[in-house]
Amino acid sequence: MKKIECIIMDWAGTAVDYGCFAPVAAFIKAFAGKGLTIDVEQTRKPMGLPKIQHIRELLTMPEVNEQFINRYRRAWTEEDVVELNHLFEKYLFASLKEYTDPIPGVIPTLEKLRAEGLKIGSTTGYTREMMDVVLPEAQAKGYRVDYCATPNLLPAGRPAPYMIFENLTKLAVPDPDTVVKVGDTIADIQEGVHAKVWSVGVVLGSNEMALTEEETHALPAAELENRIAEVKQRMLAAGASYVIRSIEELPALIQLINSKLNH
């Protein structure tokens, strides 16, 4: 009888850092350091990609590209990308520890699944050096994974599937049908689709919702439901197998997937 053997979790916006805020401020400050203005919506759009690729995507946006040309009288180059990445890393490392609190519900949910024998892997848009900060902080707060793959040591990060493949190899999981990838960005969903695993989006606490926990609780019920529905649609349009409101719904979803695997 086939059943789900492995959950692969994203990090910021899925497991820790409610609303995925750590990278946002660092990107905005980095671009400001080069005299360029980007807003929160632009900053969040490529979220989930490797951070250096995220910078390329921001520079490619027509309004940002135009700003760059107007300011520097030339097209941007890979040297500019590297310079922006250095600035981004400087600002991110200065605040990263503050953004490692596990999202409510994550620890009990994942521990319940682990107790049932599931392996817990993870992928991220953060580099290994960034995860060297995040992993011990999250673990000290009660959240741990069995493996963490980072994009900088592989042929490509998201939306390519290599980080998932590395998890499957390291955790000895041979069948992608028995794997659920959980994430909060469009890049997360695409990563799962490309790896041919069950790709699940989670809405509350996500980059796509772009709200703090306090802002989420303060929203009128009807507006909250509308926002959740919008995010769900975006995730399904990107190819999500399922979308759940919060991580607490994951065990029930796994039961549903298990029943489908055996019909």
UniProtKB/Swiss-Prot annotation:
According to the UniProt record, one GO cellular component term is: cytosol
Which catalytic reaction applies to this protein? phosphonoacetaldehyde + H2O = acetaldehyde + phosphate + H(+)
Cofactor names from the entry are: Mg(2+)
Gene Ontology BP, a term: organic phosphonate catabolic process
Q: Quaternary arrangement and interactors, per the entry? A: Homodimer.
In terms of NCBIfam families, this protein maps to: phosphonatase
The record describes how the cofactor is bound as: Binds 1 Mg(2+) ion per subunit.
Is Magnesium there in the keyword field? yes
The name of this protein is: Phosphonoacetaldehyde hydrolase
- Is-annotated flag, keyword Magnesium? yes
- A single Pfam family it belongs to is Hydrolase
Question: Which CDD domains does this UniProt record tie to the protein?
Answer: HAD_PHN (cd02586)
The role this protein plays is: Involved in phosphonate degradation.
Active site (catalytic residues): D10 (nucleophile), K51 (schiff-base intermediate with substrate)
- Keywords of this protein's UniProt record, alphabetized? Hydrolase, Magnesium, Metal-binding, Schiff base
Instruction: Detail which positions bind Mg(2+).
Output: D10, A12, D184
Q: Which GO terms describe its molecular function?
A: magnesium ion binding; phosphoglycolate phosphatase activity; phosphonoacetaldehyde hydrolase activity
Look up the EC number in the record and give it: 3.11.1.1
Give the family from UniProt: Belongs to the HAD-like hydrolase superfamily. PhnX family.
* Enzyme kind, highest EC tier: hydrolase
